């Protein structure tokens, strides 16, 4: 329990409720881009959904998936934004089990090779603006 409480204080999600307003004079408001790959066993869709909801982060319209309760916005988006990419990977196991990491690590890693994802990520890092390069949706052919 002690180690978990130490870990929790360093987890980025701890700061998401303060993304828009900051916290006293300790934390300034901040922006972020959340790039997510569907069926990722390392950073699950549930975790990504929770992060964008907690941080009140809009999802670009071309995203392959639009989480419940999150604003869907036409690009370009200035400031915080998110995009979900889908490589058509098989579903993750349900319940409290984990799928084979060699398989679902591909969902985590291969999205970084998708040209649209690269342009979105690097463009956001350079300008703070997310341009929706997905036409019509953020999908790719995952090589698994």
Outline where the language-model segments fall.
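C-terminal subdomain of alpha/beta-hydrolase-fold enzymes, centered on the catalytic histidine
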Residues: 1-144
């Amino acid at each position: 329990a002690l180690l978990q409480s130490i870990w929790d204080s360093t987890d980025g999600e701890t700061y998401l409720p303060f993304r828009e307003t900051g916290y006293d004079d300790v934390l300034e408001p901040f922006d972020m881009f959340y790039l997510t790959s569907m069926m990722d066993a390392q950073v699950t869709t549930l975790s990504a959904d929770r992060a964008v909801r907690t941080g009140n982060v809009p999802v670009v319209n071309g995203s392959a998936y639009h989480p419940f309760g999150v604003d869907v916005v036409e690009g370009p988006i200035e400031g915080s934004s998110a995009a979900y990419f889908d490589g058509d990977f098989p579903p993750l196991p349900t319940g409290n089990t984990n799928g084979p990491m060699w398989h679902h690590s591909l969902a985590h890693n291969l999205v970084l090779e998708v040209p649209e994802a690269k342009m979105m990520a690097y463009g956001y890092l350079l300008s703070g603006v997310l341009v929706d390069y997905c036409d019509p949706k953020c999908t790719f052919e995952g090589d698994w």
